[in-house]
Amino acid sequence: MSKAGQNPLALTLLDKVGLKSNADVYPATLSGGQQQRVAIARSLAMNPEVMLFDEPTSALDPELVGAILAVMKDLAKSGMTMVTVTHEMGFAKEVSDRVIFMDAGYVVEDESPKEMFTNPKNERTKAFPSRILNK
């Protein structure tokens, strides 16, 4: 891509993650949540078919989690395929087409969100989401 085409794309993607007004700000001045959203925008610049997220909210202050989840929800609504490792069970239940629950490195459930959260088969799966969702 030409240098001339980079800036408009960057601004469009920063706008998509709610940070267009921070386009001229140094990364060190951004909060953790803002830095995470910039990372998502950078990834989107590559036009991926699939986005991989590994605990995208785990290092964030609780008040910043919602902004990241909102960006991810928008990506899901736009049709982006995402593989996400998360402990955010409410998010997984709302956004996922498929939920895989792992315990000690093994897949113990692989279901639709409805099935996973209303009729889990594995004892560990039964305990975990309800414990997280009822915090």
Residue ranges and their predicted role:
Residues 40:
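Hydrophobic anchor residue at the start of the ABC signature
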Residues 45-49:
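A short, proline-enriched helix->beta-strand linker immediately N-terminal to the Walker B motif
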Residues 4-21:
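Conserved ABC ATPase "signature" region
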Residues 26-30, 34:
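Conserved ABC ATPase signature
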Residues 86-87:
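H-loop/switch region of ABC-family ATPase nucleotide-binding domains
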Residues 51-54:
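Catalytic Walker B motif of ABC-type/P-loop ATPase nucleotide-binding domains
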